[in-house]
Swiss-Prot record:
GO molecular function, one term: ATP binding
Compartments, as annotated in UniProt: Cell membrane
This protein's name: A-type ATP synthase subunit E
pH dependence comment: Optimum pH is 5.2 for ATP hydrolysis.
Biological-process GO terms, alphabetical: proton motive force-driven plasma membrane ATP synthesis
């Protein structure tokens, strides 16, 4: 009988020990699970914050890119319009009445004929230039009108073609033209 009591005491002690170990294990497991949940919440929160930040950054990049594209398109359209105005001006010069062409050439020659020994002009203006100047006619040039004067030793050329005058005025006035067209 003494042995049964000892065995029973050992079994009860073992059961108590098992219960204690199990309770500690459950507590530790619960602690680990809670800690894991907290880490998961923090990680999820960090991930959401990062995703939101990345989304905001991407949104800003898309807006900036779109704004740049709009500016590029606007500038290209403005350039196209300015080029159209320039080309229309060239066409207006080409289609000037003969009397106006003569008047302009005479004005250029009156002011600058003394600076040259030879004159060049477009094929269309050749006869008119020969008529208006005593300078030697040196040949044709590719232009919409006007003349080029050259000195005796051919070291200096003065370009009074309508092409170069228009281009010079256009470049000097580009800002003003743009302001007039686009406010």
């Amino acid at each position: 009988m003494g042995l049964e009591i000892v065995v029973k005491d050992i079994q009860e002690g073992a059961r108590a020990e098992v219960s204690r170990i199990k309770a500690e294990g459950d507590a530790k497991a619960s602690e680990i699970i809670n800690e894991a949940k907290e880490i998961q919440k923090k990680t999820l929160g960090d991930s959401l914050a990062k995703a939101e930040e990345d989304l905001q950054s991407l949104h800003q990049q898309v807006i900036s890119s779109a704004n740049l594209e709009v500016k590029r398109i606007t500038l290209n359209k403005r350039k196209e319009l300015l080029d159209t105005v320039y080309n229309q001006t060239v066409e207006n010069i080409k289609s000037m009445p003969a009397s106006k062409k003569e008047e302009l050439l005479k004005s250029i020659l009156d002011k600058h004929e003394a600076s040259g020994a030879r004159a060049y002009s477009s094929k269309e203006s050749e006869e008119l230039v020969k008529k208006l100047t005593s300078l030697s006619y040196a040949g044709n040039i590719d232009s919409i009108g006007g003349i080029v004067l050259e000195n005796e030793d051919r070291t200096v050329r003065l370009d009074f073609t309508y092409d170069s005058i228009l281009k010079s005025v256009y470049e000097r006035s580009l800002k003003q033209i743009s302001d007039i067209l686009y406010g």
